[in-house]
Amino acid sequence: MNSKLFSPYTIKNVTLKNRIVMSPMCMYSSGNEDGRVTNFHLIHYGTRAAGQVGLVMVEATAVLAEGRISNKDLGIWDDNLIEGLHKTTTFIHDNGAKAAIQLAHAGRKAELGTNAFAPSAIPFSDTMKIPVEMNIQQIKETILAFQRAALRSKQAGFDVIELHGAHGYLINEFLSPLTNKRTDEYGGSPENRYRFLREIIDSVNKVWDGPIFVRISANDYHPDGLTVQDYVQYTKWMKEQGIDLIDCSSGAVVPAHIDVYPGYQVQYAKHIKEYTKIATGAVGLITTGSQAEQILNDNEADLIFIGRELLRNPYFPRIAANELGFELQEPHQYKRAPGKIHTNK
């Protein structure tokens, strides 16, 4: 049986063997608090590659040490961190998948016991510290840090990079009027609030020639915040700059109640794709092969990002293939266990 989920997908100069992406998920497992890859990361990502995920995306990886969410985050702020990341990409590639990395700065959500930095001195909540408002020099240094991180990503062997512009972290904080109250060239109008991301993309493009994704929070879930329609304009600008795909998540820029249900964020991938003609990724409570297949067949997204379901079962692609009646070529080491995989779900 043919399956769109298990069809190859080419984006720029990279071809994925199928359309399943391991969504970036923080593991908080850099044990020595130095940003380095550990054996856990090799097993964690390598297992999903062996499980036949098409694109394995490494978790939010900090471009600056002070930009970590926690002191156990992975980092890419120094050349001495390349070696561990290169081992990770090699392990992923050896198991038949492509490798991506999400480049991130936590902004006001950094919880390191030191200063957190943001576009404006507004805390995320009453229980979190007031961040330091970034000056122009700090903004320029952070933009340069993203560029250097992109170059290190290339040296580490990654095929794709994703800029983390969602979930209330630094890029998202500049984009949203809820968190950006600046009166200089980086605040105010949508064009000015986009300037930080624009300059990051321009800077990254100078050193990176592979596909670039951007993860967005397509809804702030606040009456004065951004909606998916605001992100249509942002996405048009990103597309003009050469961004290849928008990974459509939502929320977390401010505390908010979110009604969560199966595929609740697919609507954003569909909307962005329809109104900007850019490739999109759907993410959020996509848990079965038939659900993923339907999203693709309905042309609501181009790639399917799977998060928690891959934590539950790193061999989700095999289960999805069985469900869809698609014969998936398993690793030769596992050929003694052909046929259907049974679950208790």
From Swiss-Prot:
Its cofactor is FMN. It comes from the Bacteria. It is an enzyme of class 1 (oxidoreductase). FMN binds at residues 23-26, 60, 102, 215, 307-308. GO terms for biological process: response to toxic substance. InterPro entries: Aldolase_TIM, NADPH_DH_bac, OxRdtase_FMN_N, YqjM-like. Its EC number is 1.6.99.1. One of its GO terms (molecular function) is FMN binding. Substrate binds at residues 28, 164-167. Belongs to the NADH:flavin oxidoreductase/NADH oxidase family. NamA subfamily. Homotetramer. HAMAP family: NamA. Catalyzes the reduction of the double bond of an array of alpha,beta-unsaturated aldehydes and ketones. It also reduces the nitro group of nitroester and nitroaromatic compounds. It could have a role in detoxification processes. This is NADPH dehydrogenase.
